[in-house]
């Protein structure tokens, strides 16, 4: 299959050819891209191809779901997250999925393609929404378990909404952190208070390896920062729960004081995908406030050997069938120590991106071309992952729910699941410090 860079360039050229009739005497598609005629044609093409239309599934639980963004401290040392939560109603407008064009430019950089690819992606997906009520009021009257969520390499806070919304619909508050360690394709902060007041964002883009630079030191340093950012996000949310006055730098309509006395402080977990899965492991080893963790298709390369024995909390690995490889599984198995609660399942026919919203946002052709979809239906894959997660969370957070109806999924008992792993590690000589299993882009 073609590399993702060639995929993106192929799609770009195809779109340009369809909407811009090439005149080889006057070929200037970059100048033409801003014209109303070009935009109109590309939008017609999108409609015909069924691209960029919201298909992100609604939550399957009984709660309506709200969504907002929170930024505490405008600097790049502060906390930035997207919050999903049970809401009083869902009559607010749906949430814009990817809210700034710079995220698309960051994704094009992550793919190693021309910035024009980011422009086209913005046209495809820039108006797409996700089914959560923007700035809706928190549903009051009960305390909710809290989940901190960590995104993968090249991702950002908004593109795991299918997971966040479903968990919130089952009665969780989910805080999806946007990391400032250089692993997000894009993120932003403000340089000073005056920049905040006029909305002048300072953008941080993906930190790439320099020529001759070793990867492990960079990724391990990023991993440690990610873990600190997850713990910092937890501390801030618990401060709000205690009634400490805080200001959301983004000055949205959502009243942060609603969160006072809303958190069940004994029921806190962490979930993450890929690099975020490694972040789950690092965070559990450092912060005992997290009662358990779930690593979705974890990329284990950044984890130092000293960490594996320092995780007393229950840990659940949910893997895709096509991403994992022997050295990565060997690292996971280092976590399986005596008297430690560990579980692992693999979703048959799934790919790494089955955990990311792009698997729902694209047609079958585009999905298969970019490996955003596997052989399994995307809705089935995310449903299995979410239900197994809920069952695991009920057991280890002591929830009084009915999620134990899915206990069998935690054991891999379903025709779409494999107990443990599909990867054979027998006699595999893993050279762990020189692994070639680099995490693929979230559009791969």
UniProtKB/Swiss-Prot annotation:
InterPro entries: AB_hydrolase_fold, PAF_acetylhydro_eukaryote. GO terms for biological process: phosphatidylcholine catabolic process; platelet activating factor catabolic process; platelet activating factor metabolic process. Gene3D superfamilies: alpha/beta hydrolase (3.40.50.1820). The keyword Transcription does not apply. Keywords: Glycoprotein, HDL, Hydrolase, LDL, Lipid degradation, Lipid metabolism, Phospholipid degradation, Phospholipid metabolism, Secreted, Signal. It catalyses: a 1-O-alkyl-2-acetyl-sn-glycero-3-phosphocholine + H2O = a 1-O-alkyl-sn-glycero-3-phosphocholine + acetate + H(+); 1-O-decyl-2-acetyl-sn-glycero-3-phosphocholine + H2O = 1-O-decyl-sn-glycero-3-phosphocholine + acetate + H(+); 1-O-dodecyl-2-acetyl-sn-glycero-3-phosphocholine + H2O = 1-O-dodecyl-sn-glycero-3-phosphocholine + acetate + H(+); 1-O-tetradecyl-2-acetyl-sn-glycero-3-phosphocholine + H2O = 1-O-tetradecyl-sn-glycero-3-phosphocholine + acetate + H(+). It is found in: Secreted, Extracellular space. Residues 1-21 form the signal peptide. Belongs to the AB hydrolase superfamily. Lipase family. N-glycosylated. It is an enzyme of class 3 (hydrolase). Plasma. The active site is at residues 274, 297, 352. This is Platelet-activating factor acetylhydrolase. Lipoprotein-associated calcium-independent phospholipase A2 involved in phospholipid catabolism during inflammatory and oxidative stress response. At the lipid-aqueous interface, hydrolyzes the ester bond of fatty acyl group attached at sn-2 position of phospholipids (phospholipase A2 activity). Specifically targets phospholipids with a short-chain fatty acyl group at sn-2 position. Can hydrolyze phospholipids with long fatty acyl chains, only if they carry oxidized functional groups. It comes from Bos taurus. GO terms for cellular component: high-density lipoprotein particle; low-density lipoprotein particle. GO terms for molecular function: 1-alkyl-2-acetylglycerophosphocholine esterase activity; calcium-independent phospholipase A2 activity.
